[in-house]
Regions:
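Proline-centered helix-kink/hinge sites
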Residues: 21-22, 36, 68, 89
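Well-ordered beta-strand positions in beta-sheet-rich domains
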Residues: 22-24, 29
Length: 186
């Protein structure tokens, strides 16, 4: 069924200039994986397709099977999704999955709580993909804030969301973007 809500941040001191103004977005129904892509799953793809391993693949802080893959670029993420018969979600789908029907600021609500996600620029390592069950989004998706960034299908344009019209299944502009991570690992 179609989904409508105000997408992106309202203009405020906290919002970045390219995150507004808020606007209405309609999305068709879609499915999203519950967890970030694990090193185990990504390793199967690397082996089966002969795909190059991503950055950090040999880093012992980041390469346990249950940890999310780190260092994959946009093309790697897209190729992995296609291998699994899936696709990268557009930013609007990822944002809906993270914020829920009330458009929360964080997957768990509107108050920042660093104990509910793997945050910080001095992280020693990523956490397993099923970490922080108390911060699972309304739609049941883990780690939509913190841990590693997630690539989306859209590309970046600082003026893209400056339009005020309603959007239906937006696909975004022309430079790749990621969402949700720690600021440390992609």
């Amino acid at each position: 069924t179609p989904y409508d809500r105000r997408m992106k941040a309202p203009w405020s001191a906290e919002a970045l200039r390219d995150e507004g103004p808020a606007h209405m977005v309609f999305l068709d129904s879609y499915l999203m994986d519950t967890y970030e892509v694990s090193n185990k799953d990504y390793g199967e793809f690397v082996t089966a397709k002969g795909h190059p391993a991503p950055a950090y693949w040999d880093d012992p802080r980041l390469n346990k099977p249950e940890q999310p893959v780190a260092g994959a670029n946009w093309e790697d993420a897209k190729a992995f999704c296609e291998y699994r018969g899936k696709r990268l979600p557009p930013e609007a789908e990822s944002e809906k999955a993270a914020r829920g029907p009330k458009a929360n600021l964080y997957p768990w609500g509107n108050e920042f709580d660093p104990a509910k996600a793997n945050y910080g620029r001095n992280l020693e390592a990523t956490m397993p993909v099923d970490s922080y069950p108390e911060s699972v989004s309304f739609y049941g998706v883990y780690n939509m804030a913190g841990n590693v960034f997630e690539w989306v299908a859209d590309w970046y344009d600082p003026r893209y969301y400056g339009r005020l019209e309603t959007m239906v299944n937006p696909t975004g502009p022309a430079k790749p973007i990621w969402m949700g991570g720690t600021g440390t690992y992609v």
